[in-house]
Amino acid sequence: MAKTILILDDSAPIRQVVGIALRGAGYEVIEANDGVDGLGKLDGKKVNLIITDVNMPRMDGITFVKEVKKLPRYKFTPIIILTTESQDHKKQEGRAAGAKAWVVKPFQPPQLLDAVSKLILP
């Protein structure tokens, strides 16, 4: 059975590129356009990994990570932050919230897939 990954980004083209790379690697993908939408899309589903942007409307990625980590079912779900933010203090904020990896845009699909393969449980 394919592993499921939730991707959150307010940019449809980014969601499309990430989705194509993940589907090409055999993953199932659920897409959301911000943190509020992402929490709604989780809705008790089995999700093996989450990839989120930081700067999004309604609920940013750091707040989303904090909210996900409060949910017992997703407390240990690995989260990758995929963003244009590259400052160390933002990375520290993301890790403190519970993110396990940080990938800076622009990115190459193999770079993202490498981060995914290191974190997704077999």
Residues covered by each model-derived region:
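Charged docking surfaces used in two-component/phosphorelay signaling
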Residues: 16-24
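Short hydrophobic/Thr-rich beta-strand motif most characteristic of the beta2 strand and flanking loop
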Residues: 26-33, 41
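Active-site beta3 strand of CheY-like receiver
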Residues: 46-51
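Active-site residues of response regulator receiver
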Residues: 53, 83
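Receiver (REC) domain active-site loop signature in two-component systems and cognate sites
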Residues: 56
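A Lys-centered signature of the CheY-like receiver
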Residues: 67, 105
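C-terminal output helix
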Residues: 107-117
